[in-house]
A protein has these predicted regions:
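An alpha-helical appendage that flanks or caps ligand/catalytic pockets
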Residues: 12, 125-173, 212-330
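N-terminal beta1-alpha1-beta2 module of alpha/beta enzyme domains
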Residues: 7-76, 180
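Conserved, mostly hydrophobic/aromatic
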Residues: 44, 65, 96, 138, ...
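Alpha-helix-loop-beta-strand connector modules within alpha/beta enzyme cores
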Residues: 59-79, 83, 130, 134, ...
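Active-site-adjacent beta->alpha loops and helix N-cap segments on the catalytic face
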Residues: 56-62, 208-223, 349
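Hydrophobic faces of well-ordered beta-strands that scaffold small-molecule active sites
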Residues: 16-22, 48-50, 74-77, 104-108, ...
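Short, acidic/polar
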Residues: 28-39, 92, 186-197, 256, ...
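Active-site mouth loops of central-metabolism enzymes
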Residues: 17-31, 79-86, 177-187, 243-244, ...
Length: 357
């Protein structure tokens, strides 16, 4: 069995590992995903991840692809909390953990009001408070210490009203592990701190090494609030990292620009686009505003074209291989513990060489 691909960095005595991310589907299943995940497992990648938004779900492909693996951890990045009740998510997590032999990671996220209210038909009030309550119920169900009775601001178990016949229940299956790792997708400062307080890992979507100190402070706030000694040493941070090698830096950046335009400009309404706010904190608010204006006006290609190279290079690795290696070394010194990469199976060993040295 191959050893886990890691790079040890001394500041927090953690390892930087590689994971594979398949993301959510476009019009259909991504070509070559099964082969890539099998190759990642063979190469010693730490984890493989799926996602969902308002198309493919995260759990079904993860179970299918994961059934062809032996050791790689299997995670969701992310499951939409509004898509399932806490009980349904806990059931899925326990089932996946049994089927994988204790390799499952439950990655959750609140998403945004456009998706939650538009697709899942639920209100989007107080996402932080709802997340805290949601995670707490899941942990209680998985521990299986007794029948679950919870009456909170967002969830009633048993439900009060209706036929008035509900009763506290305990899961019929016993957990493979009483503590399944829970990661939280988060971008805002309070949500990042919440991840550090109540979860076992954080799943940012965009990250820049120049923002590392700011994020570390948010994480420290959460660690302190958790009251758990040594949590910082156990906590994981897994980031999807786009890597585009090539001699022409601008052409490599052109591969990344449409994705940045989509998220900064179109993935959320004005005033409620959390990805936009990430780039604004990085110092690109003026650019992001122009991108948003163009994208929402239907000028997607033009929105992508105005994204400067420095904005791409802040969140992705593009250009000649030596340049990528040098910049990856800076990324390894941040709070990130896992680089999540995508792409075809033959590229994975090259990613390992470029990113881990």
């Amino acid at each position: 069995m191959p050893a886990r691909m890691t790079y040890c960095w001394s500041m927090s005595k953690k390892n930087v590992s590689l994971g594979y991310i398949a993301g959510y589907w476009g019009s259909g299943p991504p070509a070559g995903a099964l082969e890539a995940i099998k190759e990642a497992d063979k190469l010693g990648f730490d984890s493989a991840w799926t996602a969902e938004a308002y198309g493919s779900d995260a759990l079904t492909p993860l179970a299918w692809w994961g059934s062809h693996t032996e050791r790689i951890r299997l995670g969701t990045s992310i499951i939409q909390m509004s898509a399932r009740t806490p009980a349904a998510t806990a059931m899925a997590a326990m089932t996946m953990d049994h089927l994988s032999g204790g390799r499952f990671i439950l990655g959750l996220g609140a998403s945004g009001p456009q998706v939650v209210e538009g697709w899942y038909g639920q209100p989007y009030p107080k996402p932080l408070a709802r997340t805290r309550e949601y995670v707490g119920i899941i942990r209680e169900i998985i521990r299986r210490d007794g029948p679950v009775e919870h009456h909170g601001e967002f969830y009633d178990m048993p439900y009060k009203g209706g036929a008035n016949l509900g009763k506290p229940l305990k899961s019929t299956i016993h957990p493979h592990r009483k503590e399944i790792p829970i990661f939280l997708g988060a971008e805002g400062p309070k949500n990042v701190a919440l991840a550090a307080e109540i979860c076992d890992g954080w799943l940012p979507l965009y990250f820049s090494p120049k923002e590392d100190a700011w994020y570390r402070e948010r994480l420290r706030e959460g660690f302190a609030a958790s009251g758990e000694e040594g949590k910082e040493d156990r906590f994981e941070v897994a980031i999807p990292l786009t890597v585009v090698p090539g001699d022409d830096v601008e052409k490599c950046a052109d591969v990344v620009r449409p994705n940045l335009a989509l998220y900064a400009g179109g993935m959320g309404a004005r005033g409620a686009n959390f990805h936009f706010e990430v780039f604004a904190r990085m110092g690109y608010e003026d650019v992001a505003l122009k991108v948003q204006d163009l994208y929402l006006a239907g000028k997607k290609a033009e929105a992508a074209s105005i994204i400067p190279l420095r904005m791409v290079e802040d969140v992705a690795l593009v250009g000649p291989i030596d340049k990528i290696r040098d910049e990856a070394a800076k990324w390894r010194e941040t709070c990130i513990t896992t680089f999540l990469v995508g792409g075809p199976a033959p590229m994975l060993s090259r990613y390992a060489d470029m990113l881990l040295g």
